[in-house]
């Protein structure tokens, strides 16, 4: 059995991939607000403590955990890491795409660090795009400086804002595509956000401020447990599930000859550029833009360069090239 921690766009993708198996699985979220269509999954709602998660995994005979939760769900990630390490359960992290850190925004390691940098600017009118859960930790700043927080138009978000004592006159609600209009209304002298990635509309959030020359401060995403294995799209997810839970999908998938040849070429090129360093797997980009890793069985020096071999795996599809050695030499 597989347990997904979702509540995100990535969680929806993971559930849709697992539904292709026709097998049951569990989909866990902290709240019941996300609308997600589960064909074969069973919804589980409510925060899990260490003990609750450990008992659930044991009781439901979970053999694989997929962490597709929000990157800033730090407590959940920590709990998943501790419980799975204790029980010896593998974890796949379905990771979202993040913008390259280019220095165009001011990075902050914590909310305390962010407050210090805002005070040093100094900032007198703040637009916070960090969400309702950041109102409380940023209270030392907004108690002294005019600040506007954008939150989701939901009762639970309003309850959290009220509990923190934040004035509702300075609350704005999220509406997709209205980043520029909100910036024009508030006219802030600083904007703060989180490193939320493409599915968190990171670039759209910061574009108005950057265009106006207004400083943008970003909370960097917290580190994840070291034993996590990362996948970056539906193909990589399915291949990893096939490897870790061999009986979950009735049919195994494979890669094309072209993808296999690309992996061999990447390994040969790497050896040529890095003094013969041998890769046992090579990362390639599929036409969809997803990064996947394919195994490389052999890398050897030739008279003019390096040659690598990757073996073609076609899965359960009938293919005469299945298990064929695909070689590529780079000179």
Residue ranges and their predicted role:
Residues 129-172, 176-177:
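Anionic-ligand binding region
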Residues 54, 60-114:
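Glycine/small-residue-rich loop that forms an oxyanion/phosphate-binding "nest" at active or ligand-binding sites
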Residues 41-57, 171-181:
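Glycine-rich, highly charged phosphate/nucleotide-binding loops
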Residues 27-35, 94-99, 132-134, 152-157, ...:
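Short, polar loop motifs at secondary-structure junctions
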């Amino acid at each position: 059995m597989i347990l997904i921690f979702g509540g995100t766009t990535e969680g929806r993708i993971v559930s849709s991939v697992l539904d292709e198996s026709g097998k049951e699985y569990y989909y866990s979220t902290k709240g019941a607000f996300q609308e997600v269509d589960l064909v074969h999954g069973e919804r589980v709602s409510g925060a899990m403590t260490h003990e609750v998660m450990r008992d659930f995994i044991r009781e439901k005979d979970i053999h694989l955990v997929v962490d597709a939760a929000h990157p800033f769900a730090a407590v959940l990630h920590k709990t998943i890491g501790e419980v799975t390490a204790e029980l010896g359960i593998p974890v796949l992290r379905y990771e979202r795409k993040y913008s390259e850190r280019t220095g165009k925004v001011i990075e902050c390691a914590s909310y305390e660090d962010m407050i210090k940098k805002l005070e040093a600017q100094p900032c007198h009118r703040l637009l916070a795009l960090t969400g309702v859960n950041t109102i409380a930790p940023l209270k030392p700043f907004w108690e002294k400086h005019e600040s506007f927080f954008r939150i989701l138009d939901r009762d639970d978000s309003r309850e959290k804002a009220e509990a923190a004592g934040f004035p509702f006159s300075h609350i704005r609600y999220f509406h997709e595509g209205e980043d520029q209009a909100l910036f024009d209304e508030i006219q802030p002298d600083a904007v703060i956000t989180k490193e939320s990635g493409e599915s968190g509309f990171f670039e759209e959030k910061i574009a108005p401020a950057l265009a106006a020359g207004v400083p943008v401060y970003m909370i960097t995403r917290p580190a994840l447990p070291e034993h996590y294995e990362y996948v970056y799209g539906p193909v990589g997810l399915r291949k990893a599930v096939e490897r870790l839970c061999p009986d979950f999908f009735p049919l195994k998938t494979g890669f094309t000859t072209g993808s296999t040849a690309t992996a061999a070429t990447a390994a040969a090129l790497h050896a040529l550029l890095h003094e013969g360093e041998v890769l046992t797997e090579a990362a390639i980009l599929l036409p969809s833009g997803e990064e996947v890793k394919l195994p490389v069985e052999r890398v050897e020096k030739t008279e003019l360069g390096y040659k690598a071999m990757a073996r073609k795996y076609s899965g359960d599809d009938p293919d005469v090239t299945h298990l064929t050695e695909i070689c590529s030499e780079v000179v």
